[in-house]
Amino acid sequence: MDKEVNKSEVNNHPKIVRKKNLAEKIVIIDGQGGCGKTMLSPIIGAMDRVELLSYAFEVQWICILYKLNKIEKDAATSMVKMLIDHKLYQTMMGRDTNFRYSDLSSVFQNSNPWRYFKRIFQKGDLVIPD
């Protein structure tokens, strides 16, 4: 049987801090079903320095765990930052890129789909694309 963790024991552990981030500014589009998120996403995606639409369900799960007091705020914050940085890096390297033509998160729904085609042929980790 699992040992229940005393809240005071957890507070004695060092804080988790992530000082440097690859993603300096992020845009999160959230809301109830039918409120216009799908309409807003391509508009935001056409802006300068905005990458592909990404459904980051993991961020929702981390936030739910935090809200239910299952993880501490510093851990939740650091996990979200690491996840966002990982997703951005993978996109910049041409990995985990959606080329299904009709999907909302497809490169073909982006205002500049050719940059994603170029990325899959670049040298990889040695070159960070613009």
Model-predicted segments: where are they?
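Long, basic/Gly/Ser/Thr-rich N-terminal segments
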Residues: M1-S8
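Detector for methionine-enriched segments
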Residues: M1, M39, M47, M79-M82, ...
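Hydrophobic anchor at the beta1->P-loop junction of P-loop NTPases
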Residues: I29
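Pre-Walker A (Motif I) flank of P-loop NTPase domains
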Residues: A23-I26
